[in-house]
Amino acid sequence: MYGIEYTTILTFLISFIFLNYMLKSLTRMMDFIIYRFLFIIVILSPLIKAQNYGINLPITGSMDADYANSTQEETFLTSTLCLYYPTEAASEINDNSWKDTLSQLFLTKGWPTGSVYFKEYTDIASFSVDPQLYCDYNIVLMKYDAALQLDMSELADLILNEWLCNPMDITLYYYQQTDEANKWISMGSSCTIKVCPLNTQTLGIGCLTTDVSTFEEVATTEKLVITDVVDGVNHKLDVTTTTCTIRNCKKLGPRENVAVIQVGGSDILDITADPTTAPQTERMMRINWKKWWQVFYTVVDYVNQIIQAMSKRSRSLNSAAFYYRV
């Protein structure tokens, strides 16, 4: 009888000691994991920026304005800036170290050396055919040319907005524009666009579908054409497809990481007359024509004010991507 009681008590004590040991081991293990986790957080925290999914999020649906974010660092410390200029600027300056000089001047405005890229283009016409905007912020300098007003205004409309585009087969199909945001964008070395509106019986309205010479010519030998026709009406098109491509595009909204600066000219380019264009006067501006050195000095002086009217975006613009969202 006493042997059974002693055995029971001994079993209980052994179980208690074993359980106590297991709990202490588990506690030590959890302490190790927690302390190690906290140690890693302490080490990595200076290297990690806080994420705020509301950064630059619009309240009204417009992305033209930046909104304050307590975790957002100074723009120029984490961003790249591309400055696009015509070849004539470099030719006039005629100084092999002029880019280095400007880089040092941008440094005085807070932009580290290496964060500003200078991109040269031959002329407005060639830039219209193949615009490529890859930096976080892009500023395009366009010297006014009366002979290129159409290309300049349409280039501004192209790069200041985002477009969703698809290819068009004008040899097989008629096309219509569904609403004001729907446009046909043509690019090439020479684009001549003719259209013939059709009635419900697919007969030409004021033109013959079998005679291209009766079509209405809406663009002649241009590099870039954004065609706008009457919505909801089928059209037969004639395009110089050997030197031009045409795409059916939908304007999605403003591209906030691009600004256009018109250099000189008595006429001021304005694309805001289009009902689908959100007010963009802050990102399309004009400065008086001066020597190119003076133009660049002006840009350096006001670069941070210009950036404040923009929003950083990661999506790049490449004309080859116009079949998809650009």
UniProtKB/Swiss-Prot annotation:
Signal peptide stretch: 1-50
Disulfide bond found in the keyword field: yes
MF (Gene Ontology): metal ion binding
Post-translational modification comment from the UniProt entry: N-glycosylated. The N-terminus is blocked possibly by pyroglutamic acid.
Binding positions (Ca(2+) 1): 95, 206, 214, 216
Location of the region described as LVD motif in the Swiss-Prot/TrEMBL record: 237-239
Disulphide bridges: 82-135, 165-249, 191-244, 196-207
GO CC annotation terms, alphabetical: host cell endoplasmic reticulum lumen; T=13 icosahedral viral capsid; viral outer capsid
Residues that, per the record, bind Ca(2+) 2: 177, 228-229, 231, 301
Region (CNP motif): 165-167
Subcellular location: Virion; Host endoplasmic reticulum lumen
InterPro entries, per database record: VP7, VP7_1, VP7_2
Alphabetical UniProt keywords: Calcium, Capsid protein, Disulfide bond, Glycoprotein, Host endoplasmic reticulum, Host-virus interaction, Metal-binding, Outer capsid protein, Signal, T=13 icosahedral capsid protein, Virion
Glycosylation (residues): 69
Main location: virion
Segments for region (GPR motif): 253-255
Family per similarity comment: Belongs to the rotavirus VP7 family.
Function according to Swiss-Prot or TrEMBL: Calcium-binding protein that interacts with rotavirus cell receptors once the initial attachment by VP4 has been achieved. Rotavirus attachment and entry into the host cell probably involves multiple sequential contacts between the outer capsid proteins VP4 and VP7, and the cell receptors. Following entry into the host cell, low intracellular or intravesicular Ca(2+) concentration probably causes the calcium-stabilized VP7 trimers to dissociate from the virion. This step is probably necessary for the membrane-disrupting entry step and the release of VP4, which is locked onto the virion by VP7.
Assembly: Homotrimer; disulfide-linked. 2 Ca(2+) ions bound at each subunit interface in the trimer hold the trimer together. Interacts with the intermediate capsid protein VP6. Interacts with the outer capsid protein VP5*.
Note: Some rotavirus strains are neuraminidase-sensitive and require sialic acid to attach to the cell surface. Some rotavirus strains are integrin-dependent. Some rotavirus strains depend on ganglioside for their entry into the host cell. Hsp70 also seems to be involved in the entry of some strains.
Protein name (record): Outer capsid glycoprotein VP7
Species whose genome carries this gene: Rotavirus A (isolate RVA/Dog/United States/K9/1981/G3P5A[3]) (RV-A)
